[in-house]
Structure formats: structure tokens, C-alpha cells
Amino acid sequence: MNDSSEGFGFANQDDIENIIKIMSNGYYKCWDREFFLDLIKNRNSFLYVQRKEKSVIGFIAGKRSEEDCDIIMLIIDIKNRGEGLGSLLLSNTLLVLKDMRVKNIYLEVAVNNSSAISLYEKYGFKKINIRKSYYKFNKTMIDAVLYRMVNS
């Protein structure tokens, strides 16, 4: 893995403002700078970015224990969606987690996010539970689907 100006790599402190901008452009609840700094500094967390022409155009974040990992967000900038970059970001992250010997990978997604659900199922994530009224979008409660993948 690299932290160069192109492709997949570690996020650094200078990337945080772009990450927050990507979140806010996508109408996601934004976490603050300290949250992302903790992901970078904590050895049991990760924050990887996808760069294009030296700019951060997407990111994936998670927390892990010895054998388990929770992917807490994967977001591609709105203007770069549909280019396969989410797939690239996820596949690179799964390779890193495999190298770390992470066995179980969990994530949750809003039940109405069909593009994300298709992506996760394409990579072998299996639906294991539904969390009723988990997300709130524009005063509407949305269920979350909990997924698990066994990384072999």
C-alpha cells in the first residue's frame, strides 16, 4: 500500500478536510476532525483513501480487533460515483484485512441503498440481520441491513 498522490493508500491529517467535504456533499452525518484523527492514530482503526489526480475522491474507515473488523463507512464523492471506485476501494481494503488475518468483516447499510448493497453482495457479504429504524434520513426512519463476510 502507498500514500502517494494516486490510487489507494493511507489517509493522513491533510486529507481530513477533503473527507469531511465528501461526507457533507453526500448528505451524510458528518463527524468532526477529531474522529478522523483518531482513526488515523489508533492502531485498531483504519482510514484509507482513494485518490485521483492528487485529490481524495473516496474513503473507507473501520475498526478492528484481532480477528474481526467493522467497516463503519465507505463513501465516494458524488461526482466520481459510477466509475467503479467504490469497488476498487473495497477490494484493496479487503486485501489489507486479509494480510492482517482478519477473519470476520461486518458492516451495515441502509436498506434503501441498493448500489451499496449490490457492491457488498458482489464481494461475498451475507445478510445476517436487520436493525429496525436504525437510520434517520429527512425525519424518516430507515432500517439497516447488517452484513458479514468471512475473509478466507
Locate the predicted segments by residue.
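Short aromatic/hydrophobic contact patches that present stacked aromatics
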Residues: M73-I75, Y106-E108, L146
